[in-house]
Curated annotation (Swiss-Prot):
FHA domain: residues covered: 471-535
Binding site for ATP: 103-110
Segments of skewed composition (Polar residues): 561-570, 1378-1392, 1409-1420
Species of the source: Homo sapiens
Modified residues (Phosphothreonine): 1545
Role played: Involved in reorganization of the cortical cytoskeleton. Regulates axon formation by promoting the formation of extra axons. May be functionally important for the intracellular trafficking of MAGUKs and associated protein complexes.
Family, similarity comment: Belongs to the TRAFAC class myosin-kinesin ATPase superfamily. Kinesin family.
Domain CAP-Gly: 1721-1763
Location(s), subcellular: Cytoplasm, Cytoskeleton; Cell projection, Axon
A Pfam family recorded for this sequence: Kinesin_assoc
Native organism taxonomy: Eukaryota, Metazoa, Chordata, Craniata, Vertebrata
Protein name per UniProt: Kinesin-like protein KIF13B
Biased composition (Pro residues): 1608-1624
Amino acid sequence: MGDSKVKVAVRIRPMNRRETDLHTKCVVDVDANKVILNPVNTNLSKGDARGQPKVFAYDHCFWSMDESVKEKYAGQDIVFKCLGENILQNAFDGYNACIFAYGQTGSGKSYTMMGTADQPGLIPRLCSGLFERTQKEENEEQSFKVEVSYMEIYNEKVRDLLDPKGSRQTLKVREHSVLGPYVDGLSKLAVTSYKDIESLMSEGNKSRTVAATNMNEESSRSHAVFKITLTHTLYDVKSGTSGEKVGKLSLVDLAGSERATKTGAAGDRLKEGSNINKSLTTLGLVISALADQSAGKNKNKFVPYRDSVLTWLLKDSLGGNSKTAMVATVSPAADNYDETLSTLRYADRAKHIVNHAVVNEDPNARIIRDLREEVEKLREQLTKAEAMKSPELKDRLEESEKLIQEMTVTWEEKLRKTEEIAQERQKQLESLGISLQSSGIKVGDDKCFLVNLNADPALNELLVYYLKEHTLIGSANSQDIQLCGMGILPEHCIIDITSEGQVMLTPQKNTRTFVNGSSVSSPIQLHHGDRILWGNNHFFRLNLPKKKKKAEREDEDQDPSMKNENSSEQLDVDGDSSSEVSSEVNFNYEYAQMEVTMKALGSNDPMQSILNSLEQQHEEEKRSALERQRLMYEHELEQLRRRLSPEKQNCRSMDRFSFHSPSAQQRLRQWAEEREATLNNSLMRLREQIVKANLLVREANYIAEELDKRTEYKVTLQIPASSLDANRKRGSLLSEPAIQVRRKGKGKQIWSLEKLDNRLLDMRDLYQEWKECEEDNPVIRSYFKRADPFYDEQENHSLIGVANVFLESLFYDVKLQYAVPIINQKGEVAGRLHVEVMRLSGDVGERIAGGDEVAEVSFEKETQENKLVCMVKILQATGLPQHLSHFVFCKYSFWDQQEPVIVAPEVDTSSSSVSKEPHCMVVFDHCNEFSVNITEDFIEHLSEGALAIEVYGHKINDPRKNPALWDLGIIQAKTRSLRDRWSEVTRKLEFWVQILEQNENGEYCPVEVISAKDVPTGGIFQLRQGQSRRVQVEVKSVQESGTLPLMEECILSVGIGCVKVRPLRAPRTHETFHEEEEDMDSYQDRDLERLRRKWLNALTKRQEYLDQQLQKLVSKRDKTEDDADREAQLLEMRLTLTEERNAVMVPSAGSGIPGAPAEWTPVPGMETHIPVIFLDLNADDFSSQDNLDDPEAGGWDATLTGEEEEEFFELQIVKQHDGEVKAEASWDSAVHGCPQLSRGTPVDERLFLIVRVTVQLSHPADMQLVLRKRICVNVHGRQGFAQSLLKKMSHRSSIPGCGVTFEIVSNIPEDAQGVEEREALARMAANVENPASADSEAYIEKYLRSVLAVENLLTLDRLRQEVAVKEQLTGKGKLSRRSISSPNVNRLSGSRQDLIPSYSLGSNKGRWESQQDVSQTTVSRGIAPAPALSVSPQNNHSPDPGLSNLAASYLNPVKSFVPQMPKLLKSLFPVRDEKRGKRPSPLAHQPVPRIMVQSASPDIRVTRMEEAQPEMGPDVLVQTMGAPALKICDKPAKVPSPPPVIAVTAVTPAPEAQDGPPSPLSEASSGYFSHSVSTATLSDALGPGLDAAAPPGSMPTAPEAEPEAPISHPPPPTAVPAEEPPGPQQLVSPGRERPDLEAPAPGSPFRVRRVRASELRSFSRMLAGDPGCSPGAEGNAPAPGAGGQALASDSEEADEVPEWLREGEFVTVGAHKTGVVRYVGPADFQEGTWVGVELDLPSGKNDGSIGGKQYFRCNPGYGLLVRPSRVRRATGPVRRRSTGLRLGAPEARRSATLSGSATNLASLTAALAKADRSHKNPENRKSWAS
């Protein structure tokens, strides 16, 4: 007897896929025979035991983790060498031997014991080695016999894996005093070769219980024990005696120990798991007890062998008569640390177990003798017992006799018995029509059979069903092939084999039978390799061996080339040469399943045909593109020939822009390949998921129908929520199947695939219970009614959509205020989230620039210093769909935050809960600050990533059920959305031209521009003869004019030419106007026409499609709920389409649609009409639609009238301005060969040229843009001294240059071209009712293309956010040049007006760039707003309209006392051309006027005034101040006193190096003093300078302004007096026309006081609180209640109406305006009689209504109300200019409404106005109420 300890080995397996995906680290290492387990948590303190590595020593340690580490790696051969060879030797020596593997699920036990075909494990190697050795050693002196048995222990029950009868019956375990524990009835089969063992083992494995768990896809769910008995017989030839040694090998493969949480076990899996764990726990306890015994701790300790079947059967192997080896298998991953530690501890304990092995020599003789003695003893006992009454004794006797019989069976008998069992098995299965394959038993060549295809890869093709001549298939017992499961009827199908050998399949009525994916309802012939589906999931493949061999022979006879051609047609079915039923890769379970689904979807593989059609389309596009390219090259060659002819040699440079680059083809190919690969990949993955979804839906529908749940499931498609996140990885799935659940009478629900999958488990259980229950039991019946996994009565929140805020703005020191689109899972914008993101501290830029220096700083210090603190504000969500707007909340995670931030809305309890609006708004007012360590990853995230904010809402009833579907509100909302969509593809761009001439100092200064009524180009440039000139061009985007991401980089070229001389045109009246006269302005409508044609085409196509679809639906008889929904949707879209068509044909003013009449008042120098330039880019990616290469230059074809390409001369650019898109080009006007340009322009002629520039754009596409501007120039000769002096003394025009505003349109808005709602598309793409329909392909393709748009939405929005940030940076850069920035009161919210609530949102003052509503801004564009609006500092490009009226106010103050006004001063009152006050003045960096009030005071002598004069100096000092300080007097003073006068001087700040137009406050102006200043003008003019600080010490400043007149209780200067009716305050100057008021004498004493701007309330704020000053509805009428004082000077005007003045009369208003009288009568706004005139030209102020009252009707901008005295009779017919597209840019002018002014000042103003009538715009008349 040899005592030996259990040999223990540990094996470490490689990482599996799950662990690799988790990126878990390796914690196990091997050093010789030691295993080191490192701690997972390295952050523990040094003294903590958990932080120390644990070391275990074993007999063998196998490192199988990484094959590349050759010196360490232990493969299967090394494991066998160390353990197997020793055990094999023990078996030959006659010892019992055992080897078992122990470890958690998936640790590699089965691999170590059984291995794979390529890498066999311990058991196959032991068996193979056993037979190799027996064959070697067998001779006449010794022989070997081998017997095997194979059993499994499953759920504590023992099953025989080699029993052919009923493999499911369980066997009993018994214990015998002699034999020990054994299994009663376990088959023991004799084997003669390794092949026999292999086949038996394979057969057993197939019967073994295997199932997938999370840890391991083919996890053993049972313990398997393979026993080999080796009988070694020794013959002594001499003596003739023989002896036997018997060795027993027990090879045990244990099931994995597991944790339910990790393996995801549930239901049966959990039950199995608990039993597996029970056996293994008992095994552990047995090992512990035996280890304790061996260590001598507790010799008598009880060993609980019988607590589990496993340990009972292993009793001999553990601590008994056996030599045992144990392999502990562990995972190296940190994720499995606890399990690994537990396994290593058990293995460590097992080392101490001592076994007592003895050699089993000649056991038979001894055992038989013992047994015989026992039998005799039992017989005696039985005889003594009465009449065999003891059943126990009888059992024991039978047991012993049976054992003796088994012992005495000869070897030959054993072999015969094994053969009989095999034959019996074959017969039994054949009787069932089944044959078990791969067991070494050959299938008959002549038999036809079916092979099963199974979802479980381990069970695939295990069953073979033989077909008889007439085979019945069904679920009844009488059928030949019995199938059970869903969809199988008792009699399902019949298969017949005809005499010719053909196989015919005949399905029964109403059965579900498919052949090769197609449904079958009539008899059909089957062929070799056909796939058959019966019911829901019984898939089979047919094998016809004869047919197959015949085909093979024909194949060999065929010509090789023919063979290749046909190979594809044979479907690779016949590559079956190795085995009749070998696994055919092409026809596995998944293939068969997919085939059925694809056929059901309408074609064998719709995706394939989609790709083919795409390919064809692509080829055609390529062909047509090449044809276009050829034509373009020819065109270009022709142009080159023309250009290079000798007389035109210097015409223009060729590098305007190139149409194509040589790499065009290559780039196109690369782009197409990438796009095709993405589409292909997406289609493939989507196809797989659709297949799965359709299978689940089919099953769910079947169960729901069976249980009468009235619920229907359909597959639809949606965009995965992860794909809406801009941070997602590229190439992720664009779309995924979702399940639409609909219950009769209830709304729709959308479930995810996972949800249906989980629900199906409940449905199946319910179905099974329903099948098994008694139908007549009322309790059961009510239970089935209540149990409802089929539909959710209460739905949780749904995802409305995801808003992506790109974080690039955190690199800059600006606040990003933006309305981010919320994109839903249909790929549509479902609203906007108003967000602010801002960096509070930390500098990302410096860290990047720091480079290596930063790296040198210690890490701790670095993390402390480099922190970025930013603020995220979520203000509100607007435009949300009504049916999802309940309990809306947001969720987002910022960078590495562990927990997501949940943002709840602010609840306003006062407002009603139900809103009638189709769209809702939710206020959050959430603000959060985040502090993040700046790392390389974080910087990358900032530059590439976005903050994805998910917006959720709770659904209310099905929106389609709402009666409000046809509400006008919904149609209006759609029209509003049309306006918004246009605003997303448009942006206005200003193009300014200045001509610079060299002055006496050699500097280039802008020439003067004078406006003229007959010149529509914005003004006439006054050039001097013989001067050196430059053309300065500037291009800039207009803020808040649309959200197209338009960014100009630089000006590439400047050209000038096309000189046209025109006679001076008389002012346009009805007599002189001819429609055919060409307009010499910069307007053209070529691009507009092109855009309209394209849009109309798109609408027409869409209309045809909608009509066709509606027709289909109308003609359909049985409409489903889906059809009714779709019909309603289509009708709604058809209605919206009509609105849209009207919008194209006749866009309403201010609608924001290109070509709509403009509603604006252009600044001086700007043209009235706005031409459109259509870039025609691809809506998807802003690439060109027509060209292979870069987009052609936008606007190249938009030529002006009279433009000739040959007449242009390219100018050399001599200066580019940094930070602005501005360039100067040198211009020699002599090259044009035009005498009027060289020697001077005659007085009666106008000279026009065209300036053309090419601008490089970076956004929306990298392309060029061609802009043209027509200019008018006047060249005058050299002036004499008198003229020069006069010129210097007279006023210089304030117009800096001429400009034109373009409306740039990138493309037709995407949704305008969209055909059908994506929801409907998705549903139709996933389900097509008619399989023959070609629509299925179209729907899927259409849907996928619409889904691809999401990526474009994100890309575009990223561009918009970039542009918003860059514009803020530019604005900031400009502002920083000024000392203090002025308050920007005029910033309007660009968010939808209809969504803005009545309450304010705190800081919600910024513009929301992305949701600009062009037509609904706060100030109506048809009117000039009240003077309250200060000037926005963004656009530093136009003179402020107001400053023109101040032009005279900086002249020598001494002259102000001269009572008589010289005629020379007429020119000092230029045209009052004011606009809304949006544009800032270029004067922001120039001398800013400061105004001082001089109050009359009798006690101060004139000498004080004279003393004050030297202080002021020649330059005039002007101080900005608010309105109240400008008000001179509230009422006419009773005692006549000298009126106050405003002294104005200029403060010149430090000169700036900036080329700009000279200030109208020029020092060169003459020294006269202005007698008239308008308050409105002052506020507008001085807006930008409100905060400009005066140089300290320039003048003494008094603490407050003195009262203006000696009134007893003077009001404070900052308050509006109560006794005066509210109204715009005006300042007027004394005049000489009123004889009752004296003009001031030159010697009047004045005291000069300084008024500080800080002491005055801002004019805007004062007006904001003054109800009379809010902008009127139309026109700037004086507010009601202004009373007679509002027009003080009108008291002198006669209100008598001449007899001829009646409605319909043709009249002249002022000097130039003509029109028809439409109204004569009183008005609400002012007493007296007023005349309403409809003008011929849009130079009016309104549409006939003022203050909300309609006096007459006309087009906006054509109406005017005046006093009767301003109207005189005209002669001739009425004419009206009508060019359709140029209707409307009303040249609105604001007049100075006089109120509360001293009468003497008013009269002087009136006099000046009359004196200036011939020169001034008549619109500046005081009596107009406009």
